């Protein structure tokens, strides 16, 4: 039996979402192929391993792993055949953790260091998508030392608009702004989560999502829709007030629109060099806009990624097995293409 380690937690604003994801997987996933160990990163990114019983007893849904009392060495992860980081946000979804796995030669589920970094920075991803001929909402970015110019926002973006961290997920730090008076407060809130801030034109329309799975051959799932019962689908709506949004899976949309979304989702995946898994989010107001790509989508009880793939014919156990197997296959492929050893010469 192959050995797999499922990781959760980390020094991230989305720490609690990760705990919920790992609980959901642990309670639902039954494998005949993999022997599963659970590893947690505390709020200072210290690693600790847990028995199944200890994990379930210690961590409830959306709880926190404050401090490791039996810290382990990251090199201990090398004893596993594959690692599945069900983790979200800074340090764990932005390429940092992926770089560590790559450095130690550990197979892992998810995209490369570069793809993780690109998708985490919403502005960089937008620029690449535009270059590929895809539509995104208009935006202005504010770097860490740039001042907010309200007149420029009013003229170029208008209201309502969204102010959001450039590199955060789960709607952390996102505000919907209706007038210039609200801008400064929203920018300050977004800067709590990211040095760079985006001010983005609000698209009034449908919020749609498509799950993508695969390596060489990609599969785009059926399309789901988020129907917020509040003004927008913020962190509280997603994880605290679950009745604050209606989730339709599959979405009640024309077949032609679903086909277009699935095709565009595959194109987005390839443009941003993603692999294995990802959820592509869209807005639709008569035209289709790419919102963002989530390279480690949630696996919480309300998460659409596994639900949409199940609608497409891939059950929960099969999905997890496929992801773990893809990670091992992708790692072996990268190893075959590894650069020359330091003492090798590349002569003409």
Label each PLM-derived region with a short phrase:
Residues 1-7, 241-250, 304:
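A short small-residue
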Residues 1-109, 113-114, 118-120, 124, ...:
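ATP-binding N-terminal substructure of ATP-dependent carboxylate-amine bond-forming enzymes
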Residues 2, 254-348:
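ATP-dependent carboxylate activation and anion-phosphoryl transfer catalytic cores
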Residues 2-8, 12-13, 20, 36, ...:
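Active-site nucleotide/adenylate-binding loops and adjacent lid/helix of ATP-dependent enzymes
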Residues 53-57, 127-128, 155-157, 180, ...:
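Short, hinge-like loop/turn segments at secondary-structure boundaries
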Residues 99-108, 179, 184, 312:
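A glycine- and small-aliphatic-rich helix-loop capping segment at beta-alpha/alpha-beta transitions
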Residues 178-263, 284-289:
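Phosphate-binding site of ATP-dependent enzymes
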